[in-house]
């Protein structure tokens, strides 16, 4: 990477979108790197940024579209691009677009499309 930024998660910034799309990291080695999630990102061609989120420490090889990781990714690209709203694409096998908006008091609004995977009722004795 050209640059690395460590917060709760690690962001590795690459020069080209294609580097992010084609990478095949060693999951065992990723467990030894700082950060809860290891993210790869680059400026995008058709979006503001592309990313991938690898989470072997959480027993997830790659998160298809990671909302929590994009809190830090959005803050980074907003600062770099001097834009309050960012359009991102997570380039996992499933992939997905995220629309990220920096709000007041360090909050970030994340929106995009989702897939319903379950519907359930939870009953609890109070």
Residue ranges and their predicted role:
Residues 1-126:
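Active-site proximal loop and beta-alpha junction motif in alpha/beta enzyme cores
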